[in-house]
Amino acid sequence: MSDSQDKNYISFEKTEIGQIVSEAPAEKYVSFQKKYFNRLTIIGDSITQKGFTPGGYCAELMNFYQRRLRVDVWGFSGYTSRHVLRYLPEIPLEIDSTKLLIVFLGTNDCQLTETGYMCPVDEFKNNLLALTRPFPHSKIIIVSPGICTKDICFKREQEPYVIAASETVNTLNKSKANSAGLINLYEITKSYPTPELLFTDGLHFSSLGYSLLFNEIVATISKAWPELLPNNLPLQFPHWSEILFT
């Protein structure tokens, strides 16, 4: 159903909006947003932080969900899952209104230093579970690290972390059926005919790489939770055709 045909929207009584404006605007408006506007929350590292560059997957998801879900993005360049978990209590997340959570970490965890992995694989798995635990009512997509065509800072060994991401999804689905999905970005990028075109520097995605990731996210949602596709979500505020002559 096109946007112009959509009659399924979130409507608000004029009296309710009037009360919000007249009684303590800041406090009431925040309450109003939390009550009505559901969200897509994304947590990741630099690949997510750069996700608003032209063609970036965060920008594409924000466009995809215009006036259907608010998109909250928390990308932390250079962070491992350990670092994100450390600062999780300080991130102003809207947990109750998050319909879909995407966690894309592991690219920094799997770096091999002189003393071992930057974040050991068992800890990585536990961190993923801890990061998703505050979202018991959200659908969750775990994105595994992809390949790298060049070593940046350190050599990376992704395969154990892909397995850990898969095991995390299995654990989440045992707790609550069909609550989580996996995007195996390692296999997807590895099997791409010309993988070097997916990256700007061998690690961070080009617009082509981001497009590949965006399409995988949409495919995962379509298969597992079609009710979360934009056309199946209410429009936030009436369509212009409903109010043009009012």
Swiss-Prot record:
InterPro entries: GDSL, Iah1-like, SGNH_hydro_sf. The active site is at S46 (nucleophile), D201 (proton donor), H204 (proton acceptor). One of its GO terms (cellular component) is cytoplasm. Its EC number is 3.1.1.112. The record marks G78, N108 as: Transition state stabilizer. SUPFAM superfamilies: SGNH hydrolase. It catalyses: 3-methylbutyl acetate + H2O = 3-methylbutanol + acetate + H(+). Its main location: cytoplasm. The keyword ATP-binding does not apply. One of its GO terms (molecular function) is hydrolase activity, acting on ester bonds. It is an enzyme of class 3 (hydrolase). Keywords: Cytoplasm, Hydrolase. It is found in: Cytoplasm. The keyword Cytoplasm applies. One of its GO terms (biological process) is acetate metabolic process. Signal peptide: none annotated. Belongs to the 'GDSL' lipolytic enzyme family. IAH1 subfamily. This is Isoamyl acetate-hydrolyzing esterase. The lineage of its organism: Eukaryota, Fungi, Dikarya, Ascomycota, Taphrinomycotina. The gene is iah1.
